[in-house]
């Protein structure tokens, strides 16, 4: 065991020695970093499994840490930096507290030295580790005096723009942390404004002046900053504008209007100008900035109004590599453009009104009319017309879970518009949603439910036969499990939203309407308990949709068996159907009547109806209903009962006659104009009168 530990330590030191040598090809460097990453990950796993394990981190000193962190320098190739980030992450996980101490010492030592190279490496390291160890990174970032020193630093003349760029990259990454974002707002916003506000080439005086020596002070507005630096500063300002800081804790009210040199609209214009260029340089930062700026309704409207920009954003997403920052940023823009306000229940609406009255001194909460449903609907149409959906389909095949979640959210919003549902299906949205539902981790329940609901919306408004089957590789049964997953309301949601339930039931009803017993059989197998529960829903629309689905399901033998197997459960189900056939809502009565019309041809169902006190009365009530459709369902059910053979038929005919069925059928014949109703009622009456004369 000791020999193995010694061997691992030797391998670790050898890996660091080769990394320290330098001068290697990038591929060799990446391989060495990967080898180190594996050693560290294995070491961490061994420590977790055995507390007595001697970690290889004990041979990793400050020089070793400096070596790995040096490969995070922005002047290194992107591939090397990516592999170095993985190695750094593995080291910090394996080394624990000691690793955090060494990293902190490295950062503060480099900042204290204050040379050109030291600043670049320190800022690059801070940027790289923020997503890896956010708490440690925030501690470094918020250390006393650090942020305050950045203003004077940006006023110095350097031999290149890399110090400025590295500094702004660090600030940009740090804005993911609320405390760091507030600190940037407090200490850096003034000079960030100056950087953004100046002309890229600076003023005439600055252009003609001799370059200042390193360390000389002066106004930032008199420095000449590159476009890249300006755009980075603009992205940071966009994040500060889009995500408001927390109110002060000292009890002092925040000013209603905070002074700002550069508005969010100005920043949006900067990003738009950069994106519309034919150059790729700066696109990533501009897309990221516009993603934050487009949280504002006015910016959303300006993007939609600029057809050229909208198409360029679609093209940018088309060309962006999978899992890249540009892909995520572009998807975020389209999500912001298409996102509807959350649906509020009546209770939530009343609660918000009460809160508004309680806080009347601060003014009522403002809901921008540019973000109402009408404006969002127009934006969704514009985004669809720009050709976004095929690009989303392509990106969904190779995207990260985070990107896939954004794609699903966009399709979900587009599917709100009924006129877009069939085109969405034609452009591949159904296959996208089915794949997404299967790929999204079960831990991301909101995204999975959103994918299922978007699928339901599309399948409500399209002919399933045109979406599935034939030469299409996707079988219709692939949609049943996702739809079934949202029939039951979300168990852990704070509010009870029945819209997904309703839409799923409608979509399943559409699938069950096909002449395909296998589809009905699958729905019963996968969804029946939840469907049956919704039959008794207190929401009339949900109950109606559930009973309509039942009406289609009982066309299959498995559906009939649920009501006609002569068990107590089946009898209870018939009792519920009879009660629904007597409901106040016409739609519920119609769906229940349709199910009874199909089921009354089976003896156990017939007996169950006859044995109920009001069973026959309810069927006769359907025959007397003013609605011709309901009347037709009633006379079909009644005919099945009185035309039945054997003892069950005799019982049915006897009770129907005793309940005044002959007169009901005569009145039905007089008042009906539908030939099907007249013919069926006449046959039922004939069956009753034939027995009476025999």
Q: What would you call each of these model-derived segments?
A:
Residues 15, 197-226, 265, 317-326, ...:
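Acidic, Ser/Thr- and Gly/Pro-rich intrinsically disordered linkers and low-complexity segments
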Residues 30-50, 70, 79-95, 120-135, ...:
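Alpha-helical solenoid repeat architecture
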Residues 331-391:
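Acidic, serine/threonine- and proline-enriched intrinsically disordered linkers and terminal tails
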Residues 3-11, 35-38, 54-77, 83-118, ...:
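Alpha-solenoid helical repeat scaffolds
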Residues 25, 76-77, 114-115, 157-160, ...:
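Short inter-helical turns and helix N-cap capping residues of alpha-solenoid HEAT/ARM repeat scaffolds
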Residues 50, 54-63, 97-105, 139-145, ...:
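Short sequence/structural elements of tandem HEAT/ARM alpha-solenoid repeats
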Residues 15-19, 67-72, 103-111, 149-154, ...:
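Buried hydrophobic core positions in alpha-solenoid tandem helical repeats
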Residues 11-262, 272:
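Long amphipathic alpha-helical scaffold regions
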């Amino acid at each position: 065991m000791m020999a193995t530990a010694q061997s691992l330590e030797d391998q670790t030191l050898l890996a660091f020695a080769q990394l320290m040598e330098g001068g290697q090809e990038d591929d060799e460097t990446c391989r060495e970093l990967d080898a180190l990453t594996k050693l560290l990950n294995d070491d961490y796993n061994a420590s977790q499994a055995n507390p007595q394990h001697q970690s290889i981190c004990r041979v990793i000193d400050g020089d070793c840490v400096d070596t790995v962190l040096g490969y995070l320098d922005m002047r290194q190739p992107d591939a090397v930096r990516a592999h170095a980030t993985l190695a750094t992450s593995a080291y910090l996980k394996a080394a624990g507290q000691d690793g955090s101490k060494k990293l902190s010492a490295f950062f503060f030592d480099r900042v204290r030295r204050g040379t050109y190279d030291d600043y670049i490496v320190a800022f690059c390291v801070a940027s790289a580790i923020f997503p890896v160890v956010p708490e440690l990174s925030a501690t470094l970032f918020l250390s006393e005096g650090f942020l305050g020193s950045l203003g004077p630093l940006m006023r110095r003349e350097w031999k290149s723009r890399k110090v400025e760029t590295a500094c702004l990259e660090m600030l940009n990454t740090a804005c993911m942390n609320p405390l760091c974002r507030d600190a940037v707002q407090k200490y850096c916003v003034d000079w960030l404004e100056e950087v953004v506000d100046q002309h890229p080439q600076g003023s005439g005086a600055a252009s003609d002046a001799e370059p200042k020596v390193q360390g000389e002070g002066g106004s930032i507005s008199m420095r000449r900053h590159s476009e890249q630096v300006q755009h980075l500063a603009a992205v940071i300002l966009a994040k500060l504008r889009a995500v408001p800081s927390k109110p002060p804790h000292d009890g002092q009210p925040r000013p209603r209007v905070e002074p700002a040199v550069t508005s969010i609209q100005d920043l949006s214009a900067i990003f738009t100008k950069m994106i519309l260029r034919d150059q790729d340089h700066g696109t990533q930062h501009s897309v990221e900035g516009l993603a934050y700026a487009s949280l504002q309704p006015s910016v959303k409207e300006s993007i939609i109004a600029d057809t050229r920009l909208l198409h360029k954003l679609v093209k940018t997403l088309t060309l962006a590599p999978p899992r890249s920052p540009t892909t995520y940023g572009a998807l975020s823009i389209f999500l912001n453009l298409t996102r509807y306000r959350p649906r509020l229940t009546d209770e939530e609406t009343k609660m918000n009104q009460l809160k508004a009255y309680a806080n009347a001194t601060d003014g009522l909460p403002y809901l921008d009319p540019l973000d109402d449903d009408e404006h969002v609907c127009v934006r969704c149409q514009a985004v669809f017309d720009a050709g976004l959906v095929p690009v989303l389909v392509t990106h969904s095949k190779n995207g990260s879970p985070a990107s896939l979640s954004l794609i699903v959210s966009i399709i979900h919003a587009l599917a709100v518009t009924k006129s877009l549902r069939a085109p969405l299906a034609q452009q591949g949205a159904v296959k996208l949603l089915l794949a997404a539902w299967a790929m999204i981790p079960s831990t991301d329940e909101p995204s999975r439910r959103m994918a299922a609901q978007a699928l339901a919306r599309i399948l409500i408004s399209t002919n399933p036969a045109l979406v599935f089957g034939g030469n299409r590789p996707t079988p219709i049964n692939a949609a049943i499990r996702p739809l079934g997953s949202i029939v039951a309301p979300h168990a852990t949601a704070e509010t009870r939203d029945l819209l997904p339930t309703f839409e799923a039931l409608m979509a399943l009803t559409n699938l069950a309407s096909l002449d395909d017993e296998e589809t009905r059989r699958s729905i019963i197998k996968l969804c029946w308990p939840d469907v049956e529960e919704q039959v008794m829903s207190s929401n009339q629309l949900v109950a109606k949709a559930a009973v309509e689905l039942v009406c289609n399901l009982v066309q299959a033998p498995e559906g009939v068996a649920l009501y006609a197997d002569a068990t107590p459960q089946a009898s209870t189900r018939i009792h519920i159907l009879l009660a629904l056939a007597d409901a106040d809502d016409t739609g519920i009565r119609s769906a229940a009547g349709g199910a009874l019309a199909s089921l009354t041809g089976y003896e156990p169902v017939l007996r169950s109806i006859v044995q109920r006190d009001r069973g026959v009365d309810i069927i006769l009530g359907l025959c007397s209903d003013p609605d011709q459709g309901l009347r037709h369902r009633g006379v079909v059910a009644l005919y099945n009962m009185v035309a039945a053979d054997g003892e069950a038929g005799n019982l049915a005919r006897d009770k129907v006659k005793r309940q005044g069925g002959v007169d009901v059928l005569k009145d039905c014949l007089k008042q009906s104009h539908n030939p099907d109703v007249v013919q069926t009622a006449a046959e039922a009456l004939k069956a009753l009168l034939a027995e009476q004369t025999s």
